[in-house]
């Protein structure tokens, strides 16, 4: 059973190292008499003897076996315990076999007793402590394993017994030992008193100092270890337990060598990794050699540094070899098909030693081949994608016809971003062929009768050559497309005759070049008039015809009179009576009739062939009639309000859903009229719906309908996900290309052209009143709001002027001074909107007061170009800001100009200089003088980059001298990742540097 128990003992309980014994008293070291106390004197006797090595020692012996009732005591001198809790006593003795003694009485013994007595000082006397078991504490009865006889004595054979006993706990400063004989014949040869402790040891990477054993034989004393040099604890705090026999047991926790150090000398030393090796993590494993293309520069390395020209990606493990960028792709093959292209190539000769090779395609348009190439626009399509291609092929479409392109095929891998060099690439030059035009994007109804419809459409976005003609296909909605009829037109306007009255027709149009027909446009639905509608229209036009004739006659007479007056008063300036005109006049190249139709109040009619004319709802005697005529009434049960997204002049603005019977549910914006309104407020609120309901254009906000028959009164419009243009631009500062910004401006101009063609004057055109949807389509909104602003409004944007509030910063000078609002004054406002867009929502005229703005405009000062604004766009702004309104461009001309810029992106490459060569002086607030600021924080506030204050400060860029030396790498390091923000800060730093040089030259 014993051997089996030993084999099954848990390894954790096996002793780690032999105990250390500290001797408190050893009788064998005495060179003179021991002088121990005996009682009675006739008992124990001190004599000199020899040990097993024949060394002279002092011993005690007793042999009173022939006398009965023996009680012989032997007491040691006072022994100090020196902090020990458990005492061990080793006794060497010999005992005479009682049976070998002739005639010995039965009281003969072969054992003796061991006692101890504790005391804080040496207090024993001849009589104290009493010679009895109490107060003495008995340790054990000691019996001999071997005893000697008369024969042994004759042969001088010594049979010495060695016994060890322990006792504890002891707590006083010292103790005495006593040996009691009660009738034996024995010799106490040697007594050694000692205690045990666990030795100093290095175990599990930690040093454990000497530790005293516990008071009991089963005690475990916990000892806290200290990690060896360059090691750290893992898991739980490291401990060892010292048992009662002075042996270490039960190790808990461990220390392991830190990264950069390995365990040597049986785990007792953590040595730094030699040069050329490294260790990345904590543990017992050894250092390993550096991966390929890497090295270390010192001992104790945790990773190996890549050699020049080699890199390690952020996600690469430290034991991965350093790699490099790939070489260029090879054997590029291109296949052009009209305006599409297939590119194929073979992988690079050298992948850089990596497997994450991908390809990027850089497209550059070189026009006719002369001049610098520019990046392709967003219209070019790449399949499967432009960046991160895993296969060596790509299909590119929607290229411009007759255009030279350069395509760079970049080979990149996981370390390309780490390299300071540009990716290696293979380039190919191609020229596209002639191609059919793209689809027509939008079609408008110009006019209609009972049997005809006149339609107009815009030129395709990509004509790809000269448009020869258009083909219009149409058919009744309730019939199949197989029943369609085609009509050709050399222009973008056509009148379709011989249609059925009151019938809905489906129309599609496509353009043709020498390369053939393009795709048909999307289906558009238009309806002819019913007979009843036609009769009503004729009756309404009769007064207009009469009025037009009369107006024509008056016009001829006026021309004659003017000629006579001019001839008589040549050289004198004629007073301009326009400024006394307080009404909004709608003028065009056709006659105007201002007489009221029967049953209605005064309305303004302007006739332009094929174009709807805006009717002012305030000319109705009953404005509610205008709401009924132009706005669709919606049942409140179809509207679901979800959340409030803002507040307007008349109430809250909410988002929600509209579900009309038979139609899909759509997301809408809902304006509500606050409770407690007056009748005038209700009329003014609904007037905007009466205005919006007359408009139908992709760049004008669309009215879904109104709710007037229940409370609250609502205006429901399409929902624009990105909100107002000014805040949208500020939130996305620097995120769009110039072409994208011009596209936004083109949409706004197209919407304003539509409104101007209808003879509607907006009066409050500003970026805050332009809404943007999820596709970045901009739409004009907020109709008639400025018309109803009261004098007590608190909005600082609007300032009192001549009977109302005017947004000074956006308003033309004649409108400010004389309240003269026309489409020409809207053009001035459009120029300000252009400036807002190109500056990403910056406030026009910055922090100038409204009066300062008025004074500056009167002195012919104009806004300077925003940062990175093309010269062509700033020149168009200046054209819009001509003082003479007759010299400003029409919205149609603006649309054509922007279309040309979009078709020819090279025209947008020339940036406007800070001091333009135009005749008008420019306000200079583009980049402030750094000397006007006390701190870098103030400078960042001034250039509207305050979000980077903490980044500049934490990176140490706290003085202008340091900031002026910043590079692109420094700007990236402080966390400026947006390209627009980088340009703005770099431009400001360049000006700061120039200003510093100028100051230094003046000081010299």
Curated annotation (Swiss-Prot):
Any idea where the Eph LBD domain is? 21-203
List the catalytic residues.
764
SMART domains the record matches: EPH_lbd, Ephrin_rec_like, FN3, SAM, TyrKc
> Gene3D superfamilies under this entry?
ephrin a2 ectodomain (2.60.40.1770), Galactose-binding domain-like (2.60.120.260), Immunoglobulins (2.60.40.10), Phosphorylase Kinase, domain 1 (3.30.200.20), Transcription Factor, Ets-1 (1.10.150.50), Transferase(Phosphotransferase) domain 1 (1.10.510.10), Tumor Necrosis Factor Receptor, subunit A, domain 2 (2.10.50.10)
| Spans traversing the lipid bilayer | 545-565
User: Known EC number(s)?
Assistant: 2.7.10.1
Q: Which cysteines are joined by disulfide bonds?
A: 63-185, 98-108
Cite the InterPro entries for this sequence: Eph_TM (IPR027936), EphB2_rcpt_lig-bd (IPR034238), Ephrin_rcpt_lig-bd_dom (IPR001090), Ephrin_rcpt_TKs (IPR050449), FN3_dom (IPR003961), FN3_sf (IPR036116), Galactose-bd-like_sf (IPR008979), Growth_fac_rcpt_cys_sf (IPR009030)
> Which GO biological-process labels does this protein carry?
angiogenesis; axon guidance; axonal fasciculation; dendritic spine development; dendritic spine morphogenesis; ephrin receptor signaling pathway; peptidyl-tyrosine phosphorylation; positive regulation of synapse assembly
Topological domain spans for side Cytoplasmic:
566-1004
Tissues showing expression: Wide tissue distribution throughout development and sustained expression in adult brain. The longer form (CEK5+) is specifically expressed in the central nervous system.
Q: Where is this site: Cleavage?
A: 536-537, 562-563
The family note in this entry says:
Belongs to the protein kinase superfamily. Tyr protein kinase family. Ephrin receptor subfamily.
Protein name stated in the entry: Ephrin type-B receptor 2
Q: What is the protein's species of origin?
A: Gallus gallus (Chicken)
Classification from the root reads: Eukaryota, Metazoa, Chordata, Craniata, Vertebrata
């Amino acid at each position: 059973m014993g051997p089996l128990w030993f084999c099954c003992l848990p390894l954790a309980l096996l002793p780690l190292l032999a105990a250390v014994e500290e001797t408190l008293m050893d009788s064998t070291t005495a060179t003179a008499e021991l002088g121990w106390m005996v009682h009675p004197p006739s008992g124990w006797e001190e004599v000199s003897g020899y040990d097993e090595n024949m060394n002279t020692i002092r011993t005690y012996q007793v042999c009173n076996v022939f006398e009965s009732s023996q009680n012989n005591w032997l007491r040691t001198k006072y022994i100090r315990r020196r902090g020990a809790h458990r005492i061990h006593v080793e006794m060497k003795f010999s005992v005479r076999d009682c049976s070998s003694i002739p005639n010995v009485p039965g009281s003969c013994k072969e054992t003796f007793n061991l006692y101890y007595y504790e005391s804080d000082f040496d207090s024993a006397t001849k009589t104290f402590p009493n010679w009895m078991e109490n107060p003495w504490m008995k340790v054990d009865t000691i019996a001999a394993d071997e005893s000697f006889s008369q024969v042994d004595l004759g042969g001088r054979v010594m049979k010495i017994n060695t016994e060890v006993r322990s006792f504890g706990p002891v707590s006083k400063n010292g103790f005495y030992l006593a040996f009691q004989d009660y009738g034996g014949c024995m010799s106490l040869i040697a007594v050694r008193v000692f205690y045990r402790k666990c030795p100093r040891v290095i175990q599990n990477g930690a040093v454990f100092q000497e530790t005293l054993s516990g008071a009991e034989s089963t005690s475990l004393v916990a000892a806290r270890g200290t990690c060896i040099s360059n090691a750290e604890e893992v898991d739980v705090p490291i401990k060892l337990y010292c048992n009662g026999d002075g042996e270490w047991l039960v190790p808990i926790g461990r220390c392991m060598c830190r990264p950069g150090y390995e365990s040597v000398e049986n785990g007792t030393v953590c040595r730094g990794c030699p040069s050329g090796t490294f260790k990345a993590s904590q543990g017992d494993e050894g250092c390993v050699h550096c991966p390929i293309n890497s090295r270390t520069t010192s001992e104790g390395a945790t990773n190996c540094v890549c050699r020049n020209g080699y890199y390690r990606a952020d996600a690469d493990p430290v034991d991965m070899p350093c790699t490099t960028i790939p070489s260029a792709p090879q054997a590029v093959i291109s296949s052009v098909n009209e305006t599409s292209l297939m590119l194929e190539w073979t992988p690079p000769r050298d992948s850089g030693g990596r497997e994450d090779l991908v390809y990027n395609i850089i497209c550059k348009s070189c026009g006719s081949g002369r001049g610098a190439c520019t990046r392709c626009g967003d219209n070019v399509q790449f399949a499967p994608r432009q960046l991160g291609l895993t296969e060596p092929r790509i299909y590119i479409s929607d290229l411009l016809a007759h255009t030279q392109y350069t395509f760079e095929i970049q080979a990149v891998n996981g370390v390309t971003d780490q390299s300071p060099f540009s990716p290696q690439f293979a380039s190919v030059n191609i020229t596209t062929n002639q191609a059919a035009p793209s689809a027509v994007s939008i079609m408008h109804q110009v006019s209609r009768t009972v049997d005809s419809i006149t339609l107009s459409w815009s030129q395709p976005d990509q004509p790809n050559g000269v448009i020869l003609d258009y083909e219009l296909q149409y058919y009744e909605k309730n019939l199949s497309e197989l029943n369609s009829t085609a009509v050709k037109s050399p222009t973008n306007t056509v009148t379709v005759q011989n249609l059925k009255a009151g019938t809905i027709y489906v129309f599609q149009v496509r353009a043709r070049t020498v390369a053939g027909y393009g795709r048909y446009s999307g289906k558009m639905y238009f309806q002819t008039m019913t007979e009843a509608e036609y009769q009503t229209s004729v009756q309404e036009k009769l007064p207009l015809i009469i009025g037009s004739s009369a107006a024509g006659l008056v016009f001829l007479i006026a021309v004659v009179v003017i000629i006579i007056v001019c001839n008589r008063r040549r050289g004198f300036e004629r007073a301009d009576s326009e400024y006394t005109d307080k009404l909004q006049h709608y003028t065009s190249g056709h006659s105007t009739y201002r007489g009221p139709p029967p049953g209605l109040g005064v309305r303004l009619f302007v006739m332009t062939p094929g174009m709807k004319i805006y009717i002012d709802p305030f000319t109705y005697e009953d404005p509610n009639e205008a709401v009924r005529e132009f706005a669709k009434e919606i049942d409140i049960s179809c509207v679901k309000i979800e959340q409030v997204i803002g507040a307007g002049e008349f109430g809250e603005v909410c988002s929600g859903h509209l579900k009309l019977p038979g139609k899909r549910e759509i997301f809408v914006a809902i304006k509500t009229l606050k409770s407690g309104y007056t009748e005038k407020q209700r009329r003014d609120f609904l007037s905007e719906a009466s205005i919006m309901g007359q408009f139908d254009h992709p760049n004008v906000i669309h009215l879904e309908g109104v709710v007037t028959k229940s409370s609250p009164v609502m205006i429901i419009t399409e929902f624009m996900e990105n909100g107002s243009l000014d805040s949208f631009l500020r939130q996305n500062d620097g995120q769009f290309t110039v072409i994208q910004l011009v596209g936004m401006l083109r949409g706004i101009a197209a919407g304003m052209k539509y409104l101007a063609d209808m003879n509607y004057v907006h009066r409050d055109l500003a970026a805050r009143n332009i809404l943007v949807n999820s596709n970045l389509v901009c739409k004009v909104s907020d109709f008639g709001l400025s018309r109803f602003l009261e004098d007590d409004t608190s909005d600082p944007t609007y300032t009192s002027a001549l009977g109302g509030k005017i947004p000074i910063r956006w308003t033309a000078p004649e409108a400010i001074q004389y309240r003269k609002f026309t489409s020409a004054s809207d053009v001035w406002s459009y120029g300000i909107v252009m400036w807002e867009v190109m500056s990403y929502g910056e406030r026009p005229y910055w922090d100038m007061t409204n009066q300062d703005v008025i004074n500056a405009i009167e002195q012919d000062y104009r806004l300077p170009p925003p940062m990175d604004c093309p010269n062509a766009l700033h020149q168009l702004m200046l054209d819009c800001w001509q003082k003479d309104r007759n010299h400003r461009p029409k919205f149609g001309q603006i649309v054509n100009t922007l279309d040309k810029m979009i078709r020819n992106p090279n025209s947008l490459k020339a940036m406007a200089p800070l001091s333009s060569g135009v005749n008008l002086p420019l306000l200079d607030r583009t980049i402030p003088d750094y000397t006007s600021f006390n701190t870098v924080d103030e400078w960042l506030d001034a250039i509207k980059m305050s979000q980077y204050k903490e980044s500049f400060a934490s990176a140490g860029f706290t003085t202008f001298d340091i900031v002026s030396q910043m590079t692109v790498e420094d700007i990236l390091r402080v966390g400026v990742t947006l390209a627009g923000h980088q340009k703005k800060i770099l431009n400001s730093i360049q000006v700061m540097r120039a200003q510093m040089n100028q100051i230094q030259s003046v000081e010299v």
